[in-house]
């Protein structure tokens, strides 16, 4: 049947049924929630049940476990995660039925088309920066729509349909999909060598992709660039778009001065264009989070949020799931009382920043790290950097690599990494073959008063939560 848009009145009524293949992913679930709120009939499938799928089901989405051709019958559009293989039965059925298939980033671009878009890109810090920006704009009364790659703890969700005209979202460079977006403002936090397998193992192509991302801005758009990062600073002088810089450099348009760490918080003076200064207490640890906060402050300033309102939003920020998430204290079977922090960091540069934040906030505690490497290709490409940064902690437990769909690569596993760390002569790492056994090994390593960092982008977060709920016994469900 041929549908007439003028008969339905709007696109939701014309094409009401949208199906998400891989709906439980962080990027997918956020878009699905926004579309549910817009009035679409949302369905989706995923191989795993998680907090995101359960939340969507409660909101009214029809969520199926596993993938089947029958799942897409009757749908008007299929949205697909970049993690889904081309031979997925739902994609094959959609093609045979000539149902439109849209990559996740393309659907995000469609949502952004009906709002004024702010896209946050960068190898590290996207989720925190996007979350802080959403908090600043919300505090400023702008009621933004946001789509974030992690749970904003104050909202209990990673997405929200706001009543205002602005949409702030992460722009994912990992597979180049951020080049589908056409924002009005573009933030670049930093540029690093990661996900090189998607760029022909050529860092120059990564650099070129970020340059092209800025070219997606309209001529009246704005690039917000962290000039503390050398790669981003190099872009600042080349892009033919309006640029506003931020950082701790004296040359930054928006900068932080007199930065000090006070336990889990950072204190600094926020200097805005035209010389306005405001004291800020940021409710996140680490100098890297100060940079993330500066990006959010720059966005707020551009949109007319008052400096004291920006400062209040940063001070009241409740955090994001798995970003230096302080889960509290727990007692081991040997009687040691330890503090547990859960973090998503999985790149050497991220580990270095988190370790610095931990030592700055708790300088008298031993730093014990349980780390689950993520992807064999990243472990191979960043092998020496991983060995160097992991050698700096007081005690280390390594689980096997979380493959994320990759086949094992010889010499890029946790045992090889442990040997390289051991050869540096600074620590004696413990290797656990399966992540499920991690909790029972940790009491042999921990001492009273330790700070335990549970780090990685795989499923180690479930172990951290299991330890808080059940102690160091049993396996996470």
Curated annotation (Swiss-Prot):
Keyword Acyltransferase among record annotations: no
Location relative to the cell: Cytoplasm
InterPro entries per UniProt: Mur-like_cat_sf, Mur_ligase_C, Mur_ligase_C_dom_sf, Mur_ligase_cen, Mur_ligase_N, MurCDEF_pg_biosynth, UDP-N-AcMur_Ala_ligase_MurC
GO BP term (any one): regulation of cell shape
EC code: 6.3.2.8
EC top class named in words: ligase
Function according to Swiss-Prot or TrEMBL: Cell wall formation.
Pathway in which this enzyme or protein is active: Cell wall biogenesis; peptidoglycan biosynthesis
Keyword match Cell cycle: yes
Record's catalysed reaction(s): UDP-N-acetyl-alpha-D-muramate + L-alanine + ATP = UDP-N-acetyl-alpha-D-muramoyl-L-alanine + ADP + phosphate + H(+)
Protein name: UDP-N-acetylmuramate--L-alanine ligase
GO molecular function annotation: ATP binding; UDP-N-acetylmuramate-L-alanine ligase activity
């Amino acid at each position: 049947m041929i549908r007439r848009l003028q008969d339905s009145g709007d696109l939701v009524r014309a094409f009401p049924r949208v199906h998400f293949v891989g709906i439980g992913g962080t990027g997918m679930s956020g878009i699905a929630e926004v579309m549910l709120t817009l009035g679409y009939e949302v369905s989706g499938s995923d191989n795993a049940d998680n907090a995101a799928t359960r939340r969507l089901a409660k909101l009214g989405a029809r969520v199926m476990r596993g993938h089947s051709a029958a799942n897409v019958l009757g749908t008007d559009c299929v949205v697909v995660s970049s993690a889904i293989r081309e031979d997925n039965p739902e994609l094959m059925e959609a093609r045979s039925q000539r149902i439109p298939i849209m990559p996740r980033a393309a659907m995000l671009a469609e949502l952004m088309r009906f709002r004024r878009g702010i896209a946050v890109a960068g190898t590290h810090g996207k989720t925190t920066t996007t979350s802080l920006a959403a908090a600043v704009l919300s505090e400023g009364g702008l009621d933004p729509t946001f789509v974030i790659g992690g749970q904003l703890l104050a909202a209990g969700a990673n997405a929200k349909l706001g009543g205002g005209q602005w949409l702030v979202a992460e722009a994912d460079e990992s597979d180049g999909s951020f080049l589908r977006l056409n924002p009005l403002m573009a933030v670049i936090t930093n540029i690093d060598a990661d996900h090189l397998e998607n760029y022909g193992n050529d860092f120059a192509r990564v650099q070129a992709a970020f340059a092209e991302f800025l070219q997606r801005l309209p001529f009246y758009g704005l690039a917000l660039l962290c000039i503390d990062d050398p790669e981003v600073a190099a872009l600042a002088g080349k892009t033919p778009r309006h640029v506003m810089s931020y950082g701790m450099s004296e040359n930054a348009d928006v900068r932080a001065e007199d930065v000090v760490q006070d336990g889990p918080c950072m204190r600094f003076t926020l200097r805005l264009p035209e010389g306005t200064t405001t004291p800020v207490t940021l409710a996140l640890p680490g100098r890297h989070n100060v940079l993330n906060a500066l990006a959010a402050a720059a966005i707020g300033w551009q949109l007319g949020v008052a400096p004291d309102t920006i400062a209040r939003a940063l001070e009241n920020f409740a955090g994001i799931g798995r970003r230096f998430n302080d889960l509290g204290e727990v007692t081991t079977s040997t009687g040691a009382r330890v503090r547990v922090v859960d973090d998503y960091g999985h790149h050497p540069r991220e580990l270095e920043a988190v370790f610095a934040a931990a030592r700055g906030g708790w300088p008298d505690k031993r730093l014990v790290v349980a780390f689950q490497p993520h992807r064999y290709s990243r472990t191979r490409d960043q092998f020496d950097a991983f060995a160097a940064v992991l050698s700096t902690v007081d005690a280390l437990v390594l689980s096997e690599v979380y493959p994320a769909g990759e086949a094992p690569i010889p010499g890029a596993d946790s045992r090889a990494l442990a040997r390289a760390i051991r050869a540096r002569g600074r620590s004696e790492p413990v290797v656990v073959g399966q992540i499920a056994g991690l909790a029972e090994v940790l009491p042999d390593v921990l001492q009273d008063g330790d700070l335990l960092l549970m780090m990685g982008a795989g499923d180690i977060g479930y172990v951290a939560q299991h330890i808080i709920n059940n102690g160091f016994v049993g396996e996470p469900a």
